[in-house]
């Protein structure tokens, strides 16, 4: 090669090198602390029920996550987001198939998951894949010793644990509390948490739990007839129950028809979402519930979130939407902390450093089991103009 040829070749190689460096720099713009802004999209897998009985909750999970993206330029950690939604369905098998499909698509993280039964079924799949899952709803109490599963919602027994001391203070000595719930994972946890916190040896909850058959979809008119007959025959001073969605609507209507007028206590899912829209004032007014969120919480994060949610969807935000909104915030912080190494393994390590989350429910942070340490609130169903609303009464406890 002549001297001229060598010079020309060096100029070409130099130009190519500069072009490559420029291209790399155009993808990563940030400071020396490792907080890049990138045009490289990050793919997130959303597992949410889009069919079956859990679809209303699945819709709320999608709305909450998408709202965070809408308020943050469609980016997480400086990256544009490709959100891939897979239908969880309503069975463990359908949920597991959704998770496996998303992992095969190369997502850097998973989020969502409505059903506790699905969560139990996908535990090993997630742990073995080492793709972090930031679950925004399902949270069975039996889910322990996990490395790659984080939860932004709660543990299923916590609503009952938070509420029980309040109920215990208000039921007189010699009184009785009837307990009723469907016979599936979340129902078992809701009852166990309440009984443990109330005091399992307390005579006021000594009567056997009234278990109902778990029904997928809308229950029939007589689905809860036997349970309600048992409640009425016991003549309790108060009722603690666990239902949600269509099951809550049917149960409360039939209970009112049967003539039950004592105080009803429940985890907040009993009156969350569209439940109150389907009930008369006489069927729901005065119900007391415990939940980690109330739409009327007075803090800056909730004012922003609730206003944007109502504007986007014309409805009151729910705890389901908040947990998913927070899952997006967790990923936003985690991806930024992960810096240039956005492998699932490095992202999972970064999630352990996200610190306090400025949530609409109030500030919270992950505890050692990877669930929120957070406040729980007492709410009462009251008239708000022409509609029924869950109105914040007080704080109950901080759990986690």
Regions found by a protein language model. Give the residues of each.
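N-terminal export signals
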Residues: 2, 8-27
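Periplasmic-binding protein-like
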Residues: 102-114, 134-136, 178-181, 235-245, ...
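Segments of small-molecule ligand-sensing domains
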Residues: 311-321, 332-387
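Short, solvent-exposed amphipathic alpha-helices that sit
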Residues: 57-72, 94, 133, 159-162, ...
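Extracellular/periplasmic periplasmic-binding protein-like sensory domains
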Residues: 252-325, 338, 389, 393-399
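Extracellular/periplasmic Venus flytrap/periplasmic-binding protein
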Residues: 141-142, 149-259, 295-304
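Beta-alpha junction/loop-to-helix N-cap segments that form part of ligand/metal-binding clefts
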Residues: 28-32, 60-61, 71, 75-143, ...
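Extracytoplasmic "Venus flytrap"
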Residues: 36-38, 45-64, 68, 86-92, ...
């Amino acid at each position: 090669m002549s001297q001229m040829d060598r010079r020309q070749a060096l100029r070409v190689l130099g130009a190519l090198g500069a072009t490559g460096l420029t291209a790399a720099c155009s993808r990563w713009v940030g400071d020396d602390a490792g907080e890049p802004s990138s045009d490289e999209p990050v793919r997130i897998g959303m597992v949410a029920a889009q069919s079956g009985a859990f679809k209303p909750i699945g819709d709320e999970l999608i709305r909450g996550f998408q709202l965070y993206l809408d308020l943050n330029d469609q980016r997480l950690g400086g990256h544009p987001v490709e959100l891939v939604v897979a239908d969880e369905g309503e069975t463990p098998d359908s949920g597991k198939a959704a998770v496996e499909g998303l992992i095969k698509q190369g997502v850097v993280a998973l989020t969502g998951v409505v059903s506790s039964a699905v969560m139990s079924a996908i535990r090993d799949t997630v742990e073995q894949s080492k793709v972090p899952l930031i679950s925004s709803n399902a949270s069975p109490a039996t889910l322990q010793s996990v490395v790659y599963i984080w939860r932004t919602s709660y543990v299923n027994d916590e609503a009952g644990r938070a509420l029980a001391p309040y109920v215990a203070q208000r039921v007189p000595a010699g009184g009785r509390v009837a307990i009723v719930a469907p016979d599936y994972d979340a129902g078992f946890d809701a009852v166990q948490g309440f009984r443990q916190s109330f005091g399992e040896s307390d005579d006021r909850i000594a009567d056997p739990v009234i278990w109902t058959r778990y029904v997928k979809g809308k229950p029939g008119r007589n689905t809860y007839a036997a349970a309600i007959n048992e409640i009425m025959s016991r003549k309790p001073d108060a009722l603690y129950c666990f239902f949600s969605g269509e099951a809550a609507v049917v149960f409360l209507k039939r209970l009112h028809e049967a003539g039950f007028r004592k105080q009803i206590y429940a985890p907040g899912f009993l009156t969350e979402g569209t439940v109150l829209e389907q009930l008369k004032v006489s069927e729901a007014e005065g119900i007391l519930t415990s939940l980690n969120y109330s739409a009327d919480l007075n803090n800056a994060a909730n004012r922003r979130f609730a206003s944007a949610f109502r504007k986007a969807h014309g409805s009151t935000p729910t705890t389901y939407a908040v947990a998913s909104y927070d899952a997006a915030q967790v990923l936003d912080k985690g991806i930024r902390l992960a810096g240039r190494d956005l492998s699932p393994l490095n992202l999972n390590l970064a999630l352990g450093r996200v610190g306090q989350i400025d949530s609409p429910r109030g500030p919270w942070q992950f505890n050692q089991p990877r669930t929120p340490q957070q406040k729980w609130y007492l709410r009462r169903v009251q008239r708000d103009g022409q509609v029924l609303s869950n109105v914040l009464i007080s704080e109950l406890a901080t759990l986690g």
